[in-house]
């Protein structure tokens, strides 16, 4: 298939729950990609978590063959991209593989913050955008208002927006005609030298790593020797083909096409999303622009509740890493929790997904330490460090300054909840950058410290707006900040698993809350237990769990007072010995509950 004018490469942009995967299902069904008996909901979402949460995590592609009204047969390559902000880099690479996008907006809800972020990325990639209004068969649908919203917020003409209901199949043929008539075909190949974009990759137990590619120039054939330009590794192509969504093997992929390649690659870490693939014998001179390594943003410790499960956890993480190169981990040990792993994630959703997959697919029961971010530390003697584990923070006397990451957040919220959202952002040390109104919704842009977001910001935003606010963010800058290490001591011993790095203005409040929480959770012992929060050597909060007292005089009825005194002195000496050598056992439930702390 060398004639590029009959190829259309497109992606679908939508907020969570606006009907992206349902529309993809209908397009596959309409073009006969699957028989009716093989159809199921969310065909392209392969993981159970993707189906349950209604989100797309890995990019998927499918080739549809469509006989248009003009009598020609078109080959439509649909790229189903992740919609969540944690996977923004995957989205940008998927968009780079396409020439156009369908912007799917729920006609009962209007434009949301995440839609905005992805649309702006598509516009940066010079995409032709076709607005599609979904759920028009619902009574609450307001297509005219939503069209106006699209024009006001995004600034693209929505007068010819396609009105559909993906669930009931209304208007699907109109979407296909719009793809054929409004989206551009791929640019003509300027050279015969292979240049292909690596869009995504995943691990197959039989084939090794399967790579999703978009051919920009040249052709990709079976048995070719290919080179990855970012890692300089070389492989021999075993199979090339495409998905319909079933796997189809073909001998060659031409310029403009999207397909898959297998080449006995052992791990996904060798295939970096956004890399350029070229011919080893005749390499292209310049790699495709936009490649950057995916760096973790949020870190936390994962520990097995039962130490005998450590090897199982180690194997499970290695298996997950096969399929998810953006997830990093290294071994660490804690005096309170034993041996575990320090893991790095792209964001909070990514962290939740990995946790959920570990408990579901590998049946692991885990303790997760408080999430932290990467801080930049400038020492007095000139050295600079990057740390993400509070336990690694050097002595404050040796530190010249500390920097923390700030994000730029866009929040869309209905008018009536604006006050609550603004006060939440202010409480989280936010700085307002922009504030505008579109119909009865407000769009606010805030600069916020990432440290404040990773705790409970998203949950609190949803609860203070009754679920109506939508939120999107990207890392902005690192700025100097007055940060301190908040340590928790139980009977004078530091519990490293509960240490966190916080802003000085929040330390006292968070320390008090943690001490009160632990007081309720740690069981009483035979001696008093002191729970303290400290900054360096200064104690900023304290709670005491009173001792249980055994009544040693219960068997003494009357008689000599010296007998009673002797028993009491014996008890006193025993308690003194316990205080000296006694170890306070902190139950796992106390750790789990204390680590769920927000800023109550």
From Swiss-Prot:
GO terms for molecular function: GTP binding; GTPase activity; guanosine tetraphosphate binding; ribosome binding; translation elongation factor activity. One of its GO terms (biological process) is positive regulation of translation. GO terms for cellular component: plasma membrane. It is found in: Cell inner membrane. Keywords: Cell inner membrane, Cell membrane, GTP-binding, Hydrolase, Membrane, Nucleotide-binding, Protein biosynthesis. Pfam families: EFG_C, GTP_EFTU, GTP_EFTU_D2, LepA_C. CDD domains: EF4_II, EF4_III, LepA, lepA_C. Residues 5-187 form the tr-type G domain. It is an enzyme of class 3 (hydrolase). Its EC number is 3.6.5.n1. Belongs to the TRAFAC class translation factor GTPase superfamily. Classic translation factor GTPase family. LepA subfamily. Required for accurate and efficient protein synthesis under certain stress conditions. May act as a fidelity factor of the translation reaction, by catalyzing a one-codon backward translocation of tRNAs on improperly translocated ribosomes. Back-translocation proceeds from a post-translocation (POST) complex to a pre-translocation (PRE) complex, thus giving elongation factor G a second chance to translocate the tRNAs correctly. Binds to ribosomes in a GTP-dependent manner. This is Elongation factor 4.
